[in-house]
Amino acid sequence: MITISENAQQHFIKLLSQQAEGTHIRVFVVNPGTAKAECGVSYCPPDAVEADDIQLPFEGFSAMVDADSKGFLEDAEIDFTTDQMGSQLTLKAPNAKLRKVADDAPLFERVHYFLQAEVNPQLAGHGGECTLVEITDDGYAVLQFGGGCNGCAQIDVTVKDGIEKQLIELMAGEIKGVKDATEHERGDHSYY
């Protein structure tokens, strides 16, 4: 569920040594499954442990995860690095904004997840986004683009050389291609 690097584990052990005995860390997601999702780490004293918490044992401490955050912390990584600029604790939770779907989930859910988790974060750098409209009976994912992608001169490259290639590779035999249903209008909002 959560990977905590050796450096981060040592950091937590040091911090917890200054807390009351039996104190753990808590890893959580506020507003899980939404665009406003944020992850955090806090102290978890013994009296704050809930009956439905999941306890993840590590050498020298445990990480507590509340039941509501569990699915959104799948594949999360915590690391602690030190360089000339100082020290930093990082928590990467790729599924915090969208719960990871099972490999055997319906095709629509798997494609939607891929777009939200892999494609939209890249498009957001250009002020763009895409949504899955439908999957046709003959295996085409129909997408709608918005923001900076609408009217962008590079949309064909994004669709054919980027999204389509990845989807065909990831979902071989299920997805034959991608169709763009957007009525592109060039304007100030367009990235290129």
UniProtKB/Swiss-Prot annotation:
Keywords: 4Fe-4S, Iron, Iron-sulfur, Metal-binding. Binds 1 [4Fe-4S] cluster per subunit. The cluster is presumably bound at the interface of two monomers. It comes from the Bacteria. [4Fe-4S] cluster binds at residues 149, 152. The keyword 4Fe-4S applies. Its cofactor is [4Fe-4S] cluster. The keyword RNA-binding does not apply. One of its GO terms (biological process) is protein maturation. Pfam families: Fe-S_biosyn (PF01521), NifU (PF01106). GO terms for molecular function: 4 iron, 4 sulfur cluster binding; iron ion binding. Belongs to the NfuA family. Homodimer. HAMAP family: Fe_S_biogen_NfuA. Involved in iron-sulfur cluster biogenesis. Binds a 4Fe-4S cluster, can transfer this cluster to apoproteins, and thereby intervenes in the maturation of Fe/S proteins. Could also act as a scaffold/chaperone for damaged Fe/S proteins. This is Fe/S biogenesis protein NfuA. It comes from Colwellia psychrerythraea (strain 34H / ATCC BAA-681). The lineage of its organism: Bacteria, Pseudomonadati, Pseudomonadota, Gammaproteobacteria, Alteromonadales.
